[in-house]
């Protein structure tokens, strides 16, 4: 009679623990915290999907007990044991450990630097490569990943084609004062991209409806909770599209992202103590006001902004507090917008542009509008903005050969995620933030 081989213990993630109640499993992770109570140890492990409490008894499992006793924080460990329901434990389950393998023990003489206590922000940013291991930071990064996934899924579902824009560019897109200049090959000058927009205008003429998603760089000397020098943007562009088309696309995109995060990352939002009821109401249509009316709102609030001024953080916050959804501000003065923005035929002093301002004071998350399609007008605008025509000959070709009305926008990922998470500062929502005085680690 042959003996049946015993099935190996399933290797699971902490996130899956509830599916394996009363079963013996193996989990691979790191020691997050440890509590001792006489002859019992209560280690808490993390594995990137969550944290779980374990229990091991000196009497029942002496080898496992000795392996864990005195183990240092963030030591890497593989544990095997039985999952039991425990309402008092994080996540509602705990593991009764039967075997332990210590993969790497953190030295006691050089302990893990981020202890379970308060640390200063500069210290945490210096240790950002370790700070992201904490449950709060990991939750934010999972929300960011969900926002990226849902945004791309939404654009794909509408028939937009993902195209890639270059990082090195020959000229400015948003203005010369915020360019990062780099030395290119054979004494050529190049710049880090400020936006992929000009390039998606080209691919939109090839593919109809497109978007790009990637990093952008702005050498803005702004030290605020809303600014990074490197951030990610999703930028759609569509041929035969107008301002209203992009406003509606922006409403649908932001709503889809927020609802997807609220549904699929509820646990992470709860960890951040985010008021999900504020997110659940983010559905189209969003409130809209003209730039003219926005000035009136600011005047009523006692803000000194006058017609023709651009809006900064203070102005955006005042306007956003009038609404519980993102607000669309449309038709800004043409003089404050980029050279490629089309003007309103009924009021040429206005641009066919819009910004979407997030509620709760998180500022602009979308900026876009309708582009110029006239070759002659675009040449004139380049000259008015003192931009080198030779660097934009390829862009002018788009107006020479089959120009059509087209429109698009850019959505700033980090500001959007910061708003969804309710974080105080944008530096928490990107794995390795690049700011005015920080490029390390």
Mark where each language-model region is.
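Short linear capping/connector segments at secondary-structure termini
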Residues: 273-278, 397
